[in-house]
Amino acid sequence: MTTSASEILSHFQEYLNAEHDLREEIRIVVRDLEQTVREIQTSLQPIHQPAQTANYLSFCENALSMFHKIQEHYKQLSSKIPLNQYYRFNDHWRFVTQRVVYMCALIIYLKEERLVSREEVADMIGVQVNREDGFHIDLDDYLMGILNLTNELSRLAMNAVTAGDYSRPLRISQFIGELDAGFREL
């Protein structure tokens, strides 16, 4: 029995169509996640206004109140990714996840002036820490998000001086110095 090339290749076409559909579903969820991230970033921008230094905690609480949406988006993503296929598709959400980590780190820094742990970030966004446990926060994404925090803190230090808060830049400098030392050990 002979099968034609078109019959053989039609099975591949079905596979390619299914993968295209899955990637499109993932893109839709990631697009919604990106929109939520923009909303949260916008809610945190007033920290740079000189008159708002006393309101850091309220901005953080407002931003945290929107994290349930982030958790829902990651839950949707997790449900769409086939078992053991995380790294096949993670290029879709890698950069937005780095921004989410940065926002988590900024919020924790503003509230407590300390570095957020990978476990805390995973808990805040509703994912796992370890790959073996399922949809997780990749170590590289965590580290890149933390690096992005330094840019925002540099901006915050300059704005703090403008607002007359001369101790904040010193604390930020010490924190970034400790962060730098930690990254040098990696």
PLM feature spans:
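Leu/Val/Ala/Ile-rich N-terminal alpha-helices, chiefly Sec-type signal peptides and the beginnings
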Residues: 1-78
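Intrinsic, low-complexity N-terminal interaction/targeting segments
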Residues: 3-10, 101, 107-148, 159, ...
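Residues that form generic nucleotide/phosphate-binding pockets
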Residues: 11, 15, 106, 179
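Non-transmembrane, amphipathic alpha-helical segments
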Residues: 14, 18-32, 51-62, 85-95, ...
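Hydrophobic faces of stable alpha-helices that mediate helix-helix packing
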Residues: 30, 34-37, 143, 147-154, ...
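A structural signal for well-ordered alpha-helices, especially hydrophobic packing surfaces
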Residues: 37, 41-44, 67, 71-74, ...
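Long, charged all-alpha helical bundle/coiled-coil segments in cytosolic proteins
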Residues: 56-132
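Long amphipathic all-alpha helical oligomerization modules
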Residues: 162-186
